[in-house]
């Protein structure tokens, strides 16, 4: 066997292998950055181009999220990618500004996700109150709070060097001074106080809020789906019972088991959607923030507890930034945005126009169960076919009639929010945009 004569670089890897690894890293990171840029740019362009997307207050939060993720792709990811490929930080004193941008943009992205979850919970739990109070001004206030908090925990501590810890051990094991290490790697070791406090504000508190809100959303949606299914069965049952034979005898009414299966299918879709939202977010950011709180407590050697090698830490960092490339897919891929994207990309006629059978079930203040169903080809204007079934009041008591005459809700519908509309897409996944509040007249608010 011929002796191995390949040269080794400073990392101990063969030069050929190190070069190939750098090429693969460059390709992967370039694709990640480009996908993040494309996705979030499309969201921003769609909102600027199409007025109906700007008319929905909920989309204000999606826009803010897209802007924060776009800034991650412009101000944060490219600089770190160059450093990863080069093997050192080539931008000198820009390190501190870059660190501040990193903290600000990442925090803004996470806080915007938190605001979206609170907005959806409020819209579903208190639709009448949401419709009155969630104005564009209120939305701008929430967005301003998220961005202000992101700036406060990033630029001020970084510029005043409050975030730095006194060095106890080198990250690469061979530097002679803190300044030289930061100039070469831009790997500033955070102080324990700043690491914990910033992690609480940037991740742990928001993720706790998101878990509570999305769990509550699922419970509300589950109850609404079951009650609406019961009302569907009651409406069909009442309609069938009014059918008579030629002899004037009523036809025997029967209940179908398909409604129970449909109810289970709807609940499963809602659960799957919420699981994807939380699962992607937690999987992307949790490893980084766990390690971010562990590293400051690391001892003088990397082999001690709480110590994480620099390669693993960098992988966790990129996992977190990858969330910015996935957010447009999760939060902006409803029917409205899909049509806008198709138009912007010029594939309005080339994209497949699969039919989406959509059924809208809403209940107005008069106790009427409204079913709106239509087949909506992508890129076309939907044509609704509305069927209104009024639950017969004869099944209620005289107290129910008094409630109706007084403008109230019949007792069987009392626990069901009269302003909640659940839109169920049988061919596509359920999204949070498909659970919308409606006005007093039973019409969907925009």
From Swiss-Prot:
GO CC annotations?
Answer: ciliary membrane; cilium; dendritic spine; endomembrane system; endoplasmic reticulum; endoplasmic reticulum membrane; G protein-coupled receptor complex; GABA-ergic synapse
GO biological process, any: operant conditioning
Predominant localisation class: membrane
Membrane topology recorded in Swiss-Prot or TrEMBL: Multi-pass membrane protein
Q: Where is the lipid attached (S-palmitoyl cysteine)?
A: 347, 351
Q: What does UniProt give as the signal peptide span?
A: none
Which residue positions does Phosphoserine occur at?
441
- Which GO molecular function annotations are given, in alphabetical order? arrestin family protein binding; dopamine binding; dopamine neurotransmitter receptor activity; dopamine neurotransmitter receptor activity, coupled via Gs; G protein-coupled receptor activity; G-protein alpha-subunit binding; heterotrimeric G-protein binding
Read off the SMART domains from this record: 7TM_GPCR_Srsx
- Glycosylation (residues): 4
Subcellular localization is given as: Cell membrane; Endoplasmic reticulum membrane; Cell projection, Cilium membrane; Cell projection, Dendrite
> Matching PANTHER family, A to Z?
ADRENERGIC RECEPTOR-RELATED G-PROTEIN COUPLED RECEPTOR, D(1A) DOPAMINE RECEPTOR
Q: Which family does it belong to?
A: Belongs to the G-protein coupled receptor 1 family.
Subunit and interaction comment? Interacts with DNAJC14 via its C-terminus. Interacts with DRD2. Interacts with DORIP1.
The protein depicted here goes by the name D(1A) dopamine receptor
